[in-house]
Amino acid sequence: SRRGFVNFLMGSGFGAMAVWMLYPVIRFLIPPKSGEPTIASVPVPWKPAEIKANSGRIFKFGSQPGILVKTPAGELRAFAATCTHLNCTVQYREEKQDIWCACHNGIYDLNGKNVSGPPPRPLEPYKVNVKGDQIVVSKGA
C-alpha cells in the first residue's frame, strides 16, 4: 500500500540519518588498531664505551623515539623520548643534567619524572641491559 511505502521511506531515512550521526561517535570511542607490531626490545647502535658520562642520545624504538642517557655517575637509563604534554621529542641537556622538551619548556629529571613545565606525567621508562658490547633497551622497566 501507499501508506506502507511512505512509512518504509521515512523509517529508512531516519535510520540512515541515525547511522550517519552515530558513526563518528563510535569511531571516537573505539580507536583503530595500530598498524605497527608491538616491539618488546631493540638494540641501540652504540657500544657502552662510545657513550660518555653526562650525555644523551636519541634512538628509534620501533617508529617512536627513545632517549638513552648516561648519567654523570655513569649509569645508563632509557625512556620514551616523547614528551607527555604534546608528544614533542625530548633531548638531554648536559649543562643542566636534565631531559628537556623544547616545545613548551617541559623538564624531566634523570629518573624521567616531570619536574616543571606543562608535562602531566613522567616519561615512560625503559629497561637497559648491557650484554658485552651491546646495549639492549626493552619496555617494562
Predicted regions and their residues:
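Active-site and channel-lining beta-strand-loop segments
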Residues: 107-108, 128
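N-terminal pre-ligand scaffold of iron-sulfur
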Residues: 3, 7-95, 122-141
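A membrane-cytosol interface segment of integral membrane proteins
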Residues: 110-119, 136
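Short cysteine/histidine-rich metal-coordination sites, predominantly Zn2+-binding motifs
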Residues: 97-105, 115-124
